[in-house]
Amino acid sequence: MAHYKEFEFDCDFGGQRAKFKFYIGTPQEGHHPLQFQAKWLSDERGGTIPDEVMKAISQLNDLAKKNSVPLPDLCVYALGSAQETQVSNHEEDADVLETQDDNAEQV
């Protein structure tokens, strides 16, 4: 049975960015984990996966092979941590803005 995980990445559609779902499993040797999905996205929807996403997934694939761990699980760990950091940064920004608004109302 295939082992894969679902992820969403911001992709470029003619200058506009939109989230798109991808499924990461263990690719065949010599293939990028998102190679076929990237081709489909380009051919069928006119979209591209950002280079930094492709590079990060490739690096995670190399690391997974080196350490004999499933790529989907490593991606959940690595990308989940990155998304949590991003969410907490946005929450901190919102807290700062709320505090500034509260202080402005008191003046």
From Swiss-Prot:
Matching InterPro entries: DUF2610
Biased segments, Acidic residues type: 92-107
Annotated stretches, region: Disordered: 86-107
Name assigned to this protein: Uncharacterized protein RP240
